[in-house]
């Protein structure tokens, strides 16, 4: 009786889940247009699919108020057809461009009433990370040959402190699944979320200095499969921003108060934890601190 083929990983076969930032409020303030950015991204995806015929690419659009799957190479009937369709783009990305246009239009309609003009809002990173992990989990449970999965976040929108808990949950889930999260941040200010995601999961974080050469950055840094990364020199983080967001006002803080029961973080002292309901004994702490102050101030005889 023949042995049943066991599920195993392939060294040089990659499953790349790309999280594409489509926040229109961010792209209206950049030096590079979204169409130019998209041309770099599609050329990069074309290169990834060309490196190995078994490679898979999934693209998730990350909008302001929603996120959705817009491309899956495993479902494309003309996978491997790299001829141009007359628009300068490979023919395999025809469905991607169509679904992306529909998604952007729908996302703009949903976000009209929620947009504030005082700052650029964040994109729904927590939702797209969750969708990426769900897709990877489905791949793990189907088929006999699993490609090496990884997530690449292409983001320019600033971090949303209100998404802190959901984003961190996704990061630790990816760490448990041994799925690295690569990040390429093209915004003005660096992203603490993406820095922590790449650091915790063993991915690569990079901020391109020249967006005109984005394709070169993507191909030289992020096109490398996980097996080959041990033989190439990739950018290493100089410093990681580990600041957290408070649960009360949803803002990034350097120092704060932590509930010893549920580990919720607050920027100001509260008598009661709003998450688990634990009562903080600040009065005892005040008495202890005042007693220690009196001991320090006691005159020497």
From Swiss-Prot:
Gene3D superfamilies from the UniProt entry: von Willebrand factor, type A domain
Protein name as annotated: General transcription and DNA repair factor IIH subunit TFB4
Alphabetical UniProt keywords: DNA damage, DNA repair, Metal-binding, Nucleus, Transcription, Transcription regulation, Zinc, Zinc-finger
Similarity remark: Belongs to the TFB4 family.
Domain of life of the organism encoding this protein: Eukaryota
Lineage, opening ranks: Eukaryota, Viridiplantae, Streptophyta, Embryophyta, Tracheophyta
A biological-process GO annotation: nucleotide-excision repair
Stored InterPro entries: TFIIH_Tfb4/GTF2H3, vWFA_dom_sf
Subcellular location: Nucleus
Job description of the protein: Component of the general transcription and DNA repair factor IIH (TFIIH) core complex, which is involved in general and transcription-coupled nucleotide excision repair (NER) of damaged DNA and, when complexed to CAK, in RNA transcription by RNA polymerase II. In NER, TFIIH acts by opening DNA around the lesion to allow the excision of the damaged oligonucleotide and its replacement by a new DNA fragment. In transcription, TFIIH has an essential role in transcription initiation.
Quaternary structure and partners: Component of the 7-subunit TFIIH core complex composed of XPB, XPD, TFB1/GTF2H1, GTF2H2/P44, TFB4/GTF2H3, TFB2/GTF2H4 and TFB5/GTF2H5, which is active in NER. The core complex associates with the 3-subunit CDK-activating kinase (CAK) module composed of CYCH1/cyclin H1, CDKD and MAT1/At4g30820 to form the 10-subunit holoenzyme (holo-TFIIH) active in transcription.
UniProt entry tagged with the keyword Lipid biosynthesis: no
ZnF (C4-type) intervals: 259-276
A molecular function (GO) term: zinc ion binding
GO cellular component, one term: transcription factor TFIIH core complex
